[in-house]
C-alpha cells in the first residue's frame, strides 16, 4: 500500500503519494469562517471552509492560518486541514495508509506528540513518521551532507546536515519569510497610493510578489537604475480590472531577506544566517557545507537569489573557499519530494511507528523513532 506524504507548510499544504515525483494536491493552509450570517435557506452554508474553497470565497470569510512560523498553533483548525487533505484532496481512507508528516526544525516536543496523537487517535492511521523538513529537501537534491536554507511562507531556517543527521546546535531560525515579504510589499505599495488592507487583498499582493519580484545582485546599483529609467517597471491587472504599475518595489520587497532592517527587524539576513550556521559547525565539515548550500522553499524562488547568495557568502567566507549554491528548479516542493523518496525506500519500512507501538508506548514514542 502506498504511503501518504503530507508537508504542512505555514502557507501551503503539499500532499500526495510516496513514490510520485510531485505532490497531487497543493492548497493554501487556510481555514475560513463566514463573517456574516447566512440568509438564504437551503444554501447549505458550512461553518468552515478549507484551502482553495476558502480562498475563492475569501470575500465573505475571515481567513486564519493554523500554522504560524512553521509551527502549528491551532490544533482544531489543523485537524480540519488534515481531514480535508485525506477526504477531499487525496480521497483516501487515512486508516488504510501509513502517513509521513513533516515538521519544522526545532519544533517543540509537545507538538510532535500532538501530531502523532491526532494521526493515531482521530484518523486511526496504521503507521506514521515525522521527518524534519530541511533534511527532506537535502534528500531530494541527492545529497546527505550540506546546509539547507529553507525559506517558506512562515519561517526561514538554516539547517546544517552531515551524513543525513541534522546538527541541532547549529540550526538557526529566522522569523522572516514569505508572509512578511507580502506584508512589506503591501506597505510599500501603499506608499505608491495603492491601498491593500484586508486578508483577501493580501492574497492579491502575494500574487504580485510571486509574479513580479526578483532579487537584485547589487541593491544600490539597482535602485539608481530604477530611478533613472522606467525599464524595470511592470504592470499588473487587479481582479477588478484596474492596472497598477510597480517599479523598484519589485526588488525592494525580497531585499528584506538580505536586510531585515527594512522590516524593522534587528536580525542577520539570510546570507549571514547561513554563514553563522556554518560557523557553529565543526571546522572539519565547513568545507562540505560551503560547497553544498541548498536552497529550498517558496521564498527562495525569486529570480537572482542564488547569484546574490553566492556573492554575499563569498564575501563572508575565507577567500579560498569553494562555494556552491544549489537551487533545484523544483525547490518549491523539494521537502515533499524528499518525503516521497524517503517513504518509498525499502530500508525505511522498519522506521514507521505502527499503531501497535503507539498503543503500547503512547505519543512519546515519536521522540525515540523519529530523529
UniProtKB/Swiss-Prot annotation:
Sequence similarity: Belongs to the actin family.
Organism: Dibothriocephalus dendriticus
GO molecular function terms attached to this record: ATP binding; hydrolase activity
Endpoints of the signal sequence: none
Purpose: Actins are highly conserved proteins that are involved in various types of cell motility and are ubiquitously expressed in all eukaryotic cells.
Gene3D superfamilies: 3.30.420.40, Actin, Chain A, domain 4
Protein name per Swiss-Prot or TrEMBL: Actin-5
Location of the protein in the cell: Cytoplasm, Cytoskeleton
Amino acid at each position: 500500500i502506498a504511503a501518504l506524504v503530507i508537508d504542512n507548510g505555514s502557507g501551503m499544504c503539499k500532499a500526495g503519494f510516496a513514490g510520485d515525483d510531485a505532490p497531487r494536491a497543493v492548497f493554501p493552509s487556510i481555514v475560513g469562517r463566514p463573517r456574516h450570517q447566512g440568509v438564504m435557506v437551503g444554501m447549505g452554508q458550512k461553518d468552515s471552509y478549507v484551502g482553495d474553497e476558502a480562498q475563492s470565497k475569501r470575500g465573505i470569510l475571515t481567513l486564519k492560518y493554523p500554522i504560524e512560523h512553521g509551527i502549528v498553533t491551532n490544533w482544531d483548525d489543523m485537524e480540519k486541514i488534515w481531514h480535508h487533505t485525506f477526504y477531499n484532496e487525496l480521497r483516501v481512507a487515512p486508516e488504510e495508509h501509513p502517513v509521513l508528516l513533516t515538521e519544522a526544525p526545532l519544533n517543540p516536543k509537545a507538538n510532535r506528540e500532538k501530531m502523532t496523537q491526532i494521526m493515531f487517535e482521530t484518523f486511526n492511521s496504521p503507521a506514521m513518521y515525522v521527518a524534519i523538513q530541511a533534511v527532506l529537501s537535502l534528500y531530494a537534491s541527492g545529497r546527505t551532507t550540506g546546509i539547507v536554507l529553507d525559506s517558506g511562507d512562515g519561517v526561514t531556517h538554516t539547517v546544517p546536515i552531515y551524513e543525513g543527521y541534522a546538527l541541532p546546535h547549529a540550526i538557526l531560525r529566522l522569523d522572516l519569510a514569505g508572509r512578511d515579504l507580502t506584508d512589506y510589499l503591501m506597505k510599500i505599495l501603499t506608499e505608491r497610493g495603492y491601498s491593500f488592507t484586508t486578508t483577501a487583498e493580501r492574497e492579491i499582493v502575494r500574487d504580485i510578489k510571486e509574479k513580479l519580484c526578483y532579487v537584485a545582485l547589487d541593491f544600490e546599483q539597482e535602485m539608481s537604475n530604477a530611478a533613472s529609467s522606467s525599464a524595470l517597471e511592470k504592470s499588473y491587472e487587479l481582479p477588478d480590472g484596474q492596472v497598477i504599475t510597480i517599479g523598484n518595489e519589485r526588488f525592494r520587497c525580497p531585499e528584506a531577506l538580505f536586510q531585515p532592517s527594512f522590516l524593522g527587524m534587528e536580525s542577520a539576513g539570510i546570507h549571514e544566517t547561513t554563514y553563522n550556521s556554518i560557523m557553529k559547525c565543526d571546522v572539519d565539515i565547513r568545507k562540505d557545507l560551503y560547497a553544498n548550500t541548498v536552497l529550498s522553499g517558496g521564498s527562495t524562488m525569486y529570480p537572482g537569489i542564488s547569484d546574490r547568495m553566492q556573492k554575499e557568502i563569498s564575501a563572508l567566507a575565507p577567500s579560498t573557499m569553494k562555494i556552491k549554491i544549489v537551487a533545484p528548479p523544483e525547490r518549491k516542493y523539494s521537502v515533499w519530494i524528499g518525503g516521497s523518496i524517503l517513504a518509498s525506500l525499502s530500508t525505511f519500512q522498519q522506521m514507521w511507528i505502527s499503531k501497535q507501538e503507539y498503543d503500547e508506548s503512547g505519543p512519546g514514542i515519536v521522540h525515540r523513532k523519529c530523529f
